[in-house]
């Protein structure tokens, strides 16, 4: 499925129509999902191309109470589709987040927010090294998800930016098969189409901004085939 953020409910409707024709399901997001939650959910909840609702990326604990209200409102209307909230990695500054450690951050989220699945992003390959807290992050996330009886999803990085290099096939395999080894039941890529951003210098994603395939597309395709 595709995680898709669009500018309006009408754009979401068009995207779902295209997705249905191509056999892709979308995790949708648009401003109205927040400002007009009930009518927006009712409009799309029976669409066969809908996978779920994207609510927030990398929330802090101060966001948890409002997110819990939002999740419950959506699930009251549509219990058949999941709400998606992607959590921070353990290299975020936990002191600034107001928690004792990363496990505390994950536990607080699980205790307060009744989502069906858990997900986090962690991009381990930086230049020619690997962050040394990566497997600890996977261990904590896997352990807390298992204790809560929830599935978890995890990422691999496919789009180079800042100090993150263009991924090699070996890097993609390392990330995805490590996710699987720790029990991930959903595998995610950041990103498919290369985002436009001068701040992050995104480049060489699987699909360029003008819609052309790069060598990363073929690498991602091969790893998917192996999985």
Region locations from a protein language model:
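Glycan-processing catalytic domains of CAZymes
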Residues: 1-227
């Amino acid at each position: 499925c595709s995680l898709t953020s669009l500018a309006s409910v009408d754009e979401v409707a068009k995207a779902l129509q295209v997705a249905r024709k191509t056999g892709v399901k979308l995790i949708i997001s648009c401003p109205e999902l927040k400002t007009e939650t009930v009518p927006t959910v009712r409009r799309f909840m029976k669409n066969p191309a809908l996978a779920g609702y994207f609510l927030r990326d990398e929330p802090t604990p101060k966001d948890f109470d409002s997110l819990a209200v939002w999740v419950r409102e959506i699930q009251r209307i549509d219990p058949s589709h999941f709400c998606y909230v992607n959590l921070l990695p353990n290299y975020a500054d936990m002191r600034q987040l107001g928690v004792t450690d990363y496990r505390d951050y994950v536990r607080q989220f699980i205790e307060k927010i009744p989502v069906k699945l858990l997900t986090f992003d962690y991009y381990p390959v930086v230049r020619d090294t690997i962050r040394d807290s990566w497997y600890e992050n996977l261990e904590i996330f896997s352990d807390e998800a298992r204790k809560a009886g929830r599935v978890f999803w995890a990422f691999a990085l496919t789009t180079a930016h800042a100090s993150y290099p263009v991924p090699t096939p070996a890097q993609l395999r390392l990330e995805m098969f490590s996710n699987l080894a720790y029990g991930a039941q959903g595998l995610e890529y950041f990103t498919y189409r290369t985002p436009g951003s001068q701040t992050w210098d995104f480049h060489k994603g699987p699909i360029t901004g003008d819609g052309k395939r790069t060598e990363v597309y073929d690498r991602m395709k091969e790893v998917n085939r192996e999985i």
